[in-house]
Every structure is written in C-alpha cells, then in structure tokens.
C-alpha cells in the first residue's frame, strides 16, 4: 500500500517515430533458419511482408498497399496510461482544446481548425501538468515512460498477437500488462502531439534561432485526424503533414519530449528551448532543486531527443556531445559558465558510436571519437579518475546486465552517481523478437 500511495507512473505511447521503408523483394527470399523457430510464429509473416513490400493480412498507416507503418513523424492522438494519478484535471471538460484562451496560451496563437468544444483529448504539455500534480500530491516516485513510435493501433496489434484474440476495437484495451495492471489506481486517455512549429533554423555554436517561428505552424483538425485514436481517419496524409488542403507541422521527438518534460510547446528539434529561443526548465531539474534524485534510462543513445529532454537544454537535438555534458553536469555550449548539477543516474546507449567529424551538426567544439559522449567527458566524470560517476560500459565477453549491476553496486557503496553506456551498431540496444530472442527478421546494416 505504501508503494501505491507514493508512486505516480505515466505511460506515454508516442506517435513520433517514423517507420522503415518497405524493402524491395530480393531475387530469392529465403528466411534465415534462426527465424524459423516455432516459438516465433510471426517470423514468416514478417519476412514475407518485408520482402514482398506488402502485407495481405492487414495494414495500418497512410499507405495501405505497402508493408509500412506511418511513413513519417505524425500528429496522431496517442494513448496515455496513468497509475497512481488520474486524468480528471486535463481531459474531457478540462481539455485545453475546448478553450480559445488556453489554446492561445499553449501555442502562442490560436491555431486554425484546432478549437473543438467537444474534445476529450488533452495536450502533450499536460503530461508535464500530471507530473507537477503528482509531486504536489506527495508522490515520492514519479516515472514517465515513453514508447517512441507505439500508438493505439500497434498496441492493439501486439495485444492480438499475444492473446490470439481480437478483444477490443476501442478504448483502453486488454491483453498487455500495462492495459490490465490493477495494482494501483489507473486511468486512460489520449493526447494531441502537435508542435508549435516546424522549420526553425538554428546556430548551434551561438545557441540562437535564425528564424523564430519557422515556416510551418502546428495545430490539430479533429475533422481530419479523428476525435479518438481508433476513429476512422478521413485523410491519413493529414496526420503526417502531407495533405495539400491542410498543410501543417507534425511533431518530432524533441518538441514532444520538451512538452512532456517542461510543459512548453516548441519547434521541432528543440531540447527544452521555447519557440523564441529561451531555455525552459524540465521538471526533473525543478524537483532536483527540492532534493529529489533524478535519472533517465533509455534504449537509444543517451543524448537522443527523448532522454535529452529529461534534463538538458540545446537549440538542436543533434548537438549530442553538448547535450551529454548537460546531463552529467559539465560545462556545455548552452551552459558555458555554471554547469547544470547533472543527473544522478544515466543509463542508455551510444557505445561505439564513433565519428571522426560531426562538427556540421554539433558545432566547432565537436571532439573526434564517440559522437554521443565525448572522450573528454568520460574522462572528466569517471569516479576512478576523481569524477562523480561510476561508469559501467559495454565490455567484451561480459553480459551487460552483470556489468551494470556491478557498477550500480559500486556506485551505491561509494556514494557515487552512475553512468551506464551500452549498445550495438548504430548505437541502440539490439532488437528483441516476440519470443524473447534477439534475431529480428529485418536487420539494418
């Protein structure tokens, strides 16, 4: 019962990630023997669809004739599951999409075709509101989990695959652990993911915007995109910003995660920077000032947009080395004088992501070597060299879980912070298959 009272958990299914393009069929498509295991009953379906470029058994997304999900970032309404806190303060009658004044406050203007007096959906900035409310309610642990690219339709597909049963066609659903968990008070809703704008150009070295406001505004037309995630979609290309009659900005991971973590709509590519170029503070740093321990755990490179927005500031999501400096409490291009305090725990990927030169994206202070974590950063924070972080990283011949557990134990014993750096090419964790293995049908080279 103590855990139920003290924990707030927000599970965010995000529509942000694009999909792999359909593969061209090879001269002869022979499925690898490793994928023919009877425990992986979907391997043949996936292999045939990947190499034919189409799936006769079904589709979702904007291209029915292709084996592809949504082919771009999108503005789909995405599910939000909460545990330990409700949605009454942000959804339904409290939806900001029912109010002109609240829409102006969120977007900085009144977006065209966006006001909806009947909206049940809330805004992605309200995910920040929920975390603030959880802290104010006395919750001692707040967890925000983001599944980048997993929307309502793919969640339902996974539930069908797991259970072998089509159990629902609307609402929260059933069949997956987070849908059925009843160990704490729980709620279900969905939010709009539109950004403030797209097309803002930046100067990474100066940490300045060249054209505040960009060239394309955000917004959400319910008549085009639907009132719920399971509604039939009038115009699928609208949701990916490719409708000629309603051109609009679609959200990327940086703008969306800034909204989740700092409660501010912004331009695509921004890491906790508002549309005018002003830095904003994510809730992790706000709570850290109040004595909270804060951290981020990710299956992608540590400074990628979503984990970066938990803590850092930068005008560009691609300035990886500086973003990592913010996350571990070193001076950076965005905090040149007094560095940020740094996260207590940082666990993620990016190991081996070497690049001789990435200065075009990361600016004049780019260091050759790992493009995600600069060599000088690892040296400066290493507890064995007088730094504040116990470093656990991918080690040849060792299981990552064992290396990480040993590092965590050493950090606890020594009163140190923890950095876990793992991953495979191109920097992420390996893909897990439905049967628990690590031999996906489609492997990126």
Segments and roles (model prediction):
Residues 135-140, 251-253:
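Short, surface-exposed loop/turn motifs at beta-strand boundaries within globular domains
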Residues 25-85, 93-95, 154-445:
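Surface-exposed loop and adjacent secondary-structure segments within mature catalytic domains
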Residues 8-18:
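Bacterial N-terminal signal peptides
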Residues 1-8:
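Bacterial N-terminal signal peptides that target proteins for export
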Residues 19-23:
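Boundary at the C-terminal end of the N-terminal hydrophobic targeting segment
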Residues 60, 70-136, 169, 316:
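Short coil-to-helix leader/linker segments, especially the first N-terminal amphipathic alpha-helix
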Residues 139-153, 287, 421:
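Beta-strand elements within well-structured catalytic alpha/beta cores of enzymes
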